[in-house]
Amino acid sequence: MKLHELKPAEGSRKSRKRIGRGTGSGLGRNAGKGEKGQKARAGGGVRIGFEGGQMPLYRRVPKRGFTNIFAKQYSELNVERLNIFEDGTEITPELLIEKRMIRKSKDGLKILGNGELQKKLTVKAVKFTKAAAQKIEAAGGKVEVI
């Protein structure tokens, strides 16, 4: 077999749907658009959310809440994910970004307490949950708020 002899597997590629090319093709005449009406016209159709003139759902439902522009955006990481590091490693946000465990965040790193930690680590972060701090210290590690 040569490169120019390669062909896709039988039935793996569908042929293009050629519409409006005569009645014999099976997709002639109305070209799959049914009879007359807005949806049969070129460029026809209604915008998203339009309900035929009835007040649409997105306008019937009341507005609620707001976005707090002062909300802190932390990168969050559970303690169980720190088990990949060797004993005695100093965990910093920079190290975690380098290892692609977190993305760079606006307001720093927050360590959450889900899972178990078996390694003795020094963890530096902006915030820790109570459970996370307890688990790090129980494993013989240190918690440092930066």
UniProtKB/Swiss-Prot annotation:
InterPro entries: Ribosomal_uL15, Ribosomal_uL15/eL18, Ribosomal_uL15/eL18_sf, Ribosomal_uL15_bac-type, Ribosomal_uL15_CS
Keyword Disulfide bond carried by entry: no
Hydrolase listed as a keyword: no
Ranges of Basic and acidic residues composition bias in the record: 1-13
Annotated stretches, region: Disordered: 1-47
Entry-linked SUPFAM superfamilies: Ribosomal proteins L15p and L18e
Subunit and interaction comment: Part of the 50S ribosomal subunit.
Protein name per Swiss-Prot or TrEMBL: Large ribosomal subunit protein uL15
